[in-house]
């Protein structure tokens, strides 16, 4: 049975990788990072650190990529050139002529993360040729870095040859409360055991799910901020890919306000002079 980590380079998956390095968890056969080609530089820096740290313990961190390229280029190419290739759907916010706000379909995770990883597992881990049947039964345990506060994200595998496992939920690891691991507890474990590293949130530069706080982090890097803003503008300026007039009439935006990203006021309440009665640092306990 092969043990493979779905490595997103975020807090939970980084902790699983390092717990395997320390022998707290079984030794992984490999960790797979699916590179969409549009992560912030701090994510790639952390990926490189993780690769070197895991290599000390004989665990390879493998980068897999979508065969057609990066998600940003694919989206822009479809939008501007109409070359007939398949549209890579980001869940952009949409503004209809009547002022109603919606959200587009989300297909990016499947196309640029799940599919490339499954192809790698079939070809490189199981040694299967394209369209060759996998052996019967579970061949791979695929670790998922999901903590108790986001347990609703824990989904079974659709492939019979692999099983999704959730060490923070199911494996009885000792945690500060003796039962389950929440995100803030995982952060505390990382700070105690690896105080010199900062684990970023792994998400595309132009991910529509960014909060204002996350957009402010992107804006600290002028090149990445310009990248996100120019993408936001290009999608509205050139998009003619919709299949009907109703969809073509809807403008698309990266920010939930349905305003151009350059024009959005990203300041926090404190920045605007509004006090707060509570510590707003998320402890990951609401389950959202």
Question: Which residues are covered by each model-predicted region?
Answer:
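Nucleotide-activated chemistry modules centered on ATP-dependent adenylation/adenylyltransferase
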Residues: 1-288
């Amino acid at each position: 049975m092969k043990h493979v980590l779905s490595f997103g380079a975020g807090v939970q998956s980084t902790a699983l990788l390092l717990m395997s390095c320390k022998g707290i968890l079984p030794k992984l056969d490999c960790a797979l990072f699916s590179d969409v080609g549009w992560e912030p530089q701090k994510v790639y820096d952390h990926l490189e650190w993780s690769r070197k740290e895991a290599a000390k313990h004989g665990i390879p961190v493998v980068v897999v990529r979508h065969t057609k390229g990066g998600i940003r280029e694919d989206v822009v190419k479809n939008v501007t050139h109409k070359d007939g290739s398949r549209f890579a759907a980001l869940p952009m916010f949409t503004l209809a002529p009547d002022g109603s706000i919606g959200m587009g379909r989300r297909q990016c995770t499947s196309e640029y993360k799940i599919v490339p990883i499954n192809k790698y597992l079939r070809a490189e881990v199981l040694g299967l040729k394209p369209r060759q049947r996998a052996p019967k039964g579970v061949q791979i345990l695929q670790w998922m870095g999901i903590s108790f506060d986001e347990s609703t994200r824990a989904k079974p595998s659709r492939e019979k040859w692999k099983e999704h496992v959730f060490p923070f939920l199911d494996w009885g690891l000792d945690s500060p409360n003796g039962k389950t691991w929440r995100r803030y507890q995982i952060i505390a474990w990382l700070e105690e055991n690896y105080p010199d590293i900062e684990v970023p949130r792994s998400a595309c530069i132009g991910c529509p799910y960014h909060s204002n706080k996350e957009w402010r982090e992107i804006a600290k890097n002028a090149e990445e901020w310009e990248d996100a803003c120019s993408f936001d503008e290009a999608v509205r300026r050139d998009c003619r890919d919709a299949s009907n007039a109703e969809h073509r009439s809807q403008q698309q935006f990266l920010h939930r306000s349905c305003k151009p990203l350059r024009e959005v006021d990203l300041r926090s309440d404190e920045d605007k002079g509004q006090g707060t009665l509570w510590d707003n640092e998320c402890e990951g306990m609401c389950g959202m």
